[in-house]
Amino acid sequence: VHECVVLWLTAPPDAPRSRKVTTHVELIEDFQAARPRLLSLAHRILGSLHDAEDAVQTTWIRARTADWAAVDNPEGWFTTVTARLCLDQLRARDRRGELPLLAESIPDAELAADEEFLRREDVSRALLVLLGRLTPAQRVAYVLHDLFAVPFDQIATVLDTAPANAKKLASRARLRLGAPGAEPRETAGHARIVDAFLAAARGGDIDRLVALMAPGVVRTVDPRLVREGAATEVLGARQVAEETRYFADRIHASVPMLVNGGPGAVIAPGGHPLACLRFAIADGRIARFEITRFRPDDSVRRFSDLP
């Protein structure tokens, strides 16, 4: 696994021990034991708690009518069915042009639930943003193998392909997620400047924000991202720092990233991209930054020098 990708992994809930199901009570017990892991798995694949809960619930409905006499590994059966349902959902989104799943297309209540789940489960916000760039098959193969240690022969069953092809899909996903690409030498310290800016903005530290920006800094913002009548361009370090208070709730859902090749951040409540910040940095200070709506064709990746 690529070094950058390893840093994103969080330990999923332990998989329950498998046993031959002989009674309905045993089926209920095994499913309840597996449910936290299934929900975590479905959330990583779909990026939506609402959709993940639907997938897990559908798995239970199918489990109630399955022929358990022919199943030797209930936990594996639950995983396979859940993953197939998730794959179907991703492919349906792809056909509708809904990949990646953007924040603006999600109801506020679902977005809040996604944000709470992301923080409770300690899911990497950057990873969810980047997973949205993968094809459905790549995302399923990567999540199952690299995050949940599902063997490739089982993944092949989910994807209806050969194990070798499943392995290639996971490998391609890994490359897309972790390949550092060409990074300008001068950006070596930019990641920490962006990280410090976001930390100060989250904490409301106006003096620290002023210190991180050039005196004549200019901040521009897409008018669709601010309330009606709000200034779309602000000039001066103190004025820009004061203005960040209006974006405090969004800054809490931000992660430093390279945006279209330059230093920036992605605001992604619940892991769903909403907006991009792009910074122009000169002499160790932020000289200009812009806030724009996230577009599906925006190029985003991790800073190589941030954990």
Predicted regions and their residues:
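A solvent-exposed, acidic/Ser-Thr-rich amphipathic alpha-helical stretch
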Residues: P215-S254
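Low-complexity, intrinsically disordered terminal/linker segments enriched in charged
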Residues: T292-P307
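Active-site-adjacent scaffolding segments
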Residues: P16-D54, T58-F197, D205
